[in-house]
Amino acid sequence: KATAVMFGKILDEQQRKAITWDVERGAPSKMIEQPWQTCTCLGDWHYNTRNLRKGYKSAALVVRQLVDVVSKNGNLLLSVPLRADGTFDEKEKAILDEIGRWLKTNGESVYGTRPWLVFGEGPIAEKGIALNAQASTTRSTGIWTAAK
């Protein structure tokens, strides 16, 4: 198991085999075989009281980004700027609580998972396999879930 990780922003394919590719505030358009990371934040990189008026990223947006990143073999580093006293503001706390509730319910779809190596590969894409699932969504989040 790795005890340290080295990151690099501008790496060719060969370098990505030894150094973890860091895609700042972005993501590749397809699954990448080597692990990679993207970093983003709820608002600004540093604490800024304007975000209380301007707003932060929503929990739904962060969750969608997390699922997209993980499905492409990536890691999401989420920066949550702290006030000078080391605490979160109320809006940040509410967003983190909502993300936490989603992960408590759906964490098994994120933690310890591995992407399919070929898009569309797997039991659902194979002929003759019946799918038994119920799906639902809420208009406010646009996040789909399926019954086990």
Each language-model region and where it sits:
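Mature catalytic domains of secreted/periplasmic carbohydrate-active enzymes
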Residues: 1-148
